[in-house]
Amino acid sequence: MTLVRERRHQEPLTLSIPPLIYHGTAFSVASSSSSSPETSPIQTLNDLEKLSVLGQGSGGTVYKTRHRRTKTLYALKVLRPNLNTTVTVEADILKRIESSFIIKCYAVFVSLYDLCFVMELMEKGSLHDALLAQQVFSEPMVSSLANRILQGLRYLQKMGIVHGDIKPSNLLINKKGEVKIADFGASRIVAGGDYGSNGTCAYMSPERVDLEKWGFGGEVGFAGDVWSLGVVVLECYIGRYPLTKVGDKPDWATLFCAICCNEKVDIPVSCSLEFRDFVGRCLEKDWRKRDTVEELLRHSFVKNR
């Protein structure tokens, strides 16, 4: 879900939203072995106090909340399952995963109308926010974030999960400056030959945009996440979407040509040879020849980061 972030400096909010009283079921997804105070059990949504709206889209809203007893801050993502059938898949995936490279989900509350995710609060927003603020990403910074994203993708692949929508707005940053993968609304668990095309077109790989030309196989979903990573790291370095020219209208026809037809991606001459090679391996159009996550983690551009 692409969120439209609201202004941080605003008058005190009177939130015209449903009260935090749910008669549905709840399940915790936090690790029972963790001793961190942030994993204090949340028994009910009444344990949380809404502070502000962080963002909202057609499928739901994300709130900044505070635990009434511990004062710990959380993000509360409220979705309507009847408006978006993928949210039940997202809930199932979040129950399975726990990694320091992926945003943490502490609990999910289910009611007749809403699906509510109690999430780790990422204080510095997303990579998309940083790009809008014209933050400059040096090569070492890009290398570090690429390493973290690859670590997260490796974990997901071991769990048999294709993220399916790696893009700047789904890569969140905490107060330590650590980037974590978020939003599993377009994700799927690889089984039964399901190679659907949910996700954001601009970050889709050629085989997802044009299945007839490129074909598909058991690794195609994972290879698509690698392509998306390549687009993201290059976008962070040059400060804009890298597959189209400045001034191009980002419609379907333009994106299709940029992703599937253009011979090569323009990479600035200021990039190091290591960076150019890394991006080239990510943005190989034939998914059969594209580097895997494991191969990229051994690449000199991200190794030992």
Swiss-Prot record:
Gene3D superfamilies per record? Transferase(Phosphotransferase) domain 1 (1.10.510.10)
Location of Phosphothreonine modifications: 200
Residues that, per the record, bind ATP: 54-62, 77
InterPro entries recorded: Kinase-like_dom_sf, Prot_kinase_dom, Protein_kinase_ATP_BS, Ser/Thr_kinase_AS, Ser_Thr_kinase
Provide the alphabetized UniProt keywords: ATP-binding, Kinase, Nucleotide-binding, Phosphoprotein, Serine/threonine-protein kinase, Transferase
Entry's EC annotation: 2.7.12.2
In its keyword annotation, does this UniProt entry include Phosphoprotein? yes
Enzyme superclass (EC):
transferase
> Where is the catalytic site?
165
Q: Does the keyword Cytoplasm apply?
A: no
**Pfam families assigned to the protein according to its UniProt record, in alphabetical order:** Pkinase
Reaction catalysed by this chain? L-seryl-[protein] + ATP = O-phospho-L-seryl-[protein] + ADP + H(+); L-threonyl-[protein] + ATP = O-phospho-L-threonyl-[protein] + ADP + H(+); L-tyrosyl-[protein] + ATP = O-phospho-L-tyrosyl-[protein] + ADP + H(+)
Which stretches make up the Protein kinase domain?
A: 48-302
Q: Which residues carry this modification: Phosphoserine?
A: 34
Subunit-structure text: Interacts with P.syringae type III effector HopF2.
What protein is this chain from? Answer: Mitogen-activated protein kinase kinase 10
Species this chain originates from: Arabidopsis thaliana
Q: Which gene encodes it?
A: MKK10
